[in-house]
Amino acid sequence: GPKTATLAEMGAYLRRAEDLGFDSAVSIDHLLMTPPAYACTWLEPVALLSALAGVTRTIKLGTMVLVLPLRNPAYFAKEWATLDLLSGGRTILGVGVGWHEEEFALMGIPHKERGRRMDEMLELVTALWAGDNVTYAGKYYQVKNLTIDPKPVQKPHPPIWIGGGSQPFEKVYGQTVTNIDPVLKRIAKYAKTWVPHSSATADMVTGDWNKIQRFMEEFGRKPGDMTKVYSNFVYVLKKGEKPEVAAPHFKVYSGMDLPYWKEFYLLGEAEELAEKIRAKVAALGGCEQIVLNPLNWSTEQLELLAGEVLPRVAKP
């Protein structure tokens, strides 16, 4: 955002999150500003999480999502394994193919190759984490008898979350996806956890999950092999508070207007938000984790989530 919190402020915030029982904290990854979807820049996630590992105790640290095709596979394998080591095995690797064409042009990587590059990267990076003297001959990446140390603390490797799926308003992201099946096949083949788009409708999520389950069978996996996460930006309104009070916070992140925020993000009082979360979780057929992204570093929103929203979500 326009004012980045200091490491001391971030550490205090996350330690309070630990005290309130939150399980994990994740970072978004963008090399550049990407308006209108996001109207801000982001700290580089691996450097950020390395710093946060030193000022937290138990909370898991991850990305949601890191644009994997922008990285070099061997360098990234070492970089993330180092983070897993420094954090005591607390990392969650959430990855996606990315979408912002300017970022790929800047890195000299053809935008249309990003999906196939990500497939190869997932294969090569996990192989480098699992063993030594790795030989890999892909279209984009080749190594011979390569060993990368250190290995991650978590075995065989940190959990891999993959984000993606159907979504409305492709214009927000500057692209139109005509065939989502390659994305869903990638999720079915490689993901320990699937993270659908926060803006996806219940019907989209249900349709994607049905396809993912069919693709998993093709890869010899069972639906029970994969967990699911619901994620969204959130702003909890206090009793009687108007939605407009959240506008300055949402505008830091998104160039969209208030009706868009109300429809696709979590903006409302506690009971309304709990109902929205329960509905999306039901569309997923249940999920193992809910990731809620407050819009500032104030612990007030954390307290409202822990004290007012999540207990209502958990109600039978």
Where are these regions (language model features)?
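Active-site-adjacent structural elements that line small-molecule/cofactor binding pockets in enzymes
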Residues: 1-316
